[in-house]
């Protein structure tokens, strides 16, 4: 689908379904309080989607870990142990919330909150389906990357506020790692934005739609897209502190990293924020390179597979499944690859990924200029 077709046909159809469009339409003839209230009510499903992804990411981690080790994992609480995570939340709610006497109480308390807010706010710009988009921003991709990077503030507050040398070491490692890997990750995403000609995640998704299914996805349209795709996926592992980049939480060196001193629900919030970041980076890579809500199935003759598997409900299904696939790969790698050393981590970022990211940026620009 061309940019002209997008502006003439698709945008009026899709933009009218976003939550902020509903608010703008109501603001013209109602008091300001009603649109705000309706917007909050309409955002409730977004809250449930985010909490569902965060909560059952823990369950998925346990089951996948058990599968890798030829175990069963949680089985007792609910069918197949599906309520185990809820039981753990109830347990953590009853635990004592301990604040070390020597800790900076303000920083110690706000650290987990900043982490969780950073993970949750990024969900607002994710286009889950043609009929459900929290906010369609013309800089949506930039917003998502920036909000996810907000975790640096929470991590540093948690590590410094704990007044514990292991927590501080873990926080410094994590901040250095995240800030470093933001560079190749951002350049890789710019390659996707260059192919689409926009930073609006909704438009990026629409431009990858078509009856040929996966053939319209940028990963298959442009052979160069495989390079930024792999660069962003590797960098996203480092940004989410997943193996083999889980150096900030190295148990044998730092006990538990920057959240060593946390207990009760503060510990749970930090844990949930990590799974929120995992889903967020997985959703971003699905939107930019794999068509987001678009069905990968093509229309083949009389079998209109793409037509049958498109729409609001199917759109949400596809983007969630694509996101869960990358989450599965992240969990799989945890039990496959050994942890890197700090020097190896930085070498990979500055000497390998960053140069290749610049190369992919130049190649993508040349492809967009000279290949019709």
From Swiss-Prot:
Where in the cell is the protein located?
Cell inner membrane
Q: How does it sit in the membrane?
A: Multi-pass membrane protein
> What superkingdom heads the lineage?
Bacteria
Q: What would be one Pfam family of this protein?
A: NADHdh
Q: What is its EC number?
A: 7.1.1.-
GO MF annotations for this entry?
Answer: NADH dehydrogenase activity; oxidoreductase activity, acting on NAD(P)H, quinone or similar compound as acceptor; quinone binding
Q: Which class of enzymes does this protein belong to?
A: translocase
Q: Where are the transmembrane segments?
A: 34-54, 106-126, 139-159, 178-198, 217-237, 278-298, 313-333, 352-372
GO BP terms: namely: aerobic respiration
What main location does UniProt list? Answer: membrane
GO cellular component terms, A-Z = plasma membrane
Quaternary structure, per UniProt, is: NDH-1 is composed of 14 different subunits. Subunits NuoA, H, J, K, L, M, N constitute the membrane sector of the complex.
Q: Which family does it belong to?
A: Belongs to the complex I subunit 1 family.
Q: Under what name is this protein listed? A: NADH-quinone oxidoreductase subunit H
Organism whose genome encodes this protein: Chlorobium chlorochromatii (strain CaD3)
Gene (UniProt): nuoH
């Amino acid at each position: 689908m061309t940019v002209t077709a997008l502006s003439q046909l698709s945008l009026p159809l899709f933009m009218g379904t976003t939550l902020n469009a509903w608010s703008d339409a109501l603001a013209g003839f109602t008091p300001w309080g009603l649109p705000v209230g309706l917007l909050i009510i309409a955002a409730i499903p977004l809250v449930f989607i985010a909490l569902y992804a965060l909560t059952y990411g823990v369950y998925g981690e346990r089951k996948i870990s058990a599968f890798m080790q030829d175990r069963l994992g949680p089985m007792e609480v609910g069918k197949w142990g599906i309520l185990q995570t809820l039981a753990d939340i109830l347990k953590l709610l009853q635990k004592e919330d301990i604040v070390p006497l020597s800790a900076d109480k303000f920083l110690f308390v706000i650290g987990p909150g900043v982490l969780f807010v950073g993970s949750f706010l990024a969900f607002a710009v994710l286009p889950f389906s043609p009929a459900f988009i929290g906010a369609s921003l013309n800089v949506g991709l930039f917003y998502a990357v920036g909000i996810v990077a907000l975790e640096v503030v929470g991590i540093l507050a948690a590590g410094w506020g704990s007044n514990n040398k292991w927590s501080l070491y873990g926080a410094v490692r994590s901040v250095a790692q995240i800030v470093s890997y933001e560079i190749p990750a951002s350049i890789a995403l710019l390659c996707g934005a260059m192919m689409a000609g926009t930073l609006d995640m909704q438009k990026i998704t629409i431009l990858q739609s078509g009856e040929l299914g996966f053939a319209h996805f940028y990963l298959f349209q442009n052979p160069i897209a495989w390079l930024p795709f792999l660069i962003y996926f590797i960098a996203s592992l480092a940004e989410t502190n997943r193996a083999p980049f889980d150096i900030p939480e190295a148990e044998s060196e730092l006990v538990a990293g920057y959240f060593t001193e946390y207990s009760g629900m503060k510990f749970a919030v930090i844990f949930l924020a990590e799974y929120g970041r995992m889903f967020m980076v997985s959703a971003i890579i699905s939107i930019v390179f794999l068509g987001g809500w678009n069905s990968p199935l093509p229309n083949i003759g009389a079998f209109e597979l793409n037509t049958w598997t498109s729409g609001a409900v199917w759109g949400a299904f596809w983007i969630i499944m694509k996101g869960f696939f990358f989450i599965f790969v992240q969990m799989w790698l945890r039990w496959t690859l050994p942890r890197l050393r700090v020097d190896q981590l930085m070498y990979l970022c500055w000497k390998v990924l960053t140069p290749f990211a610049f190369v992919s940026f130049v190649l993508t620009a040349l492809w967009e200029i000279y290949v019709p």
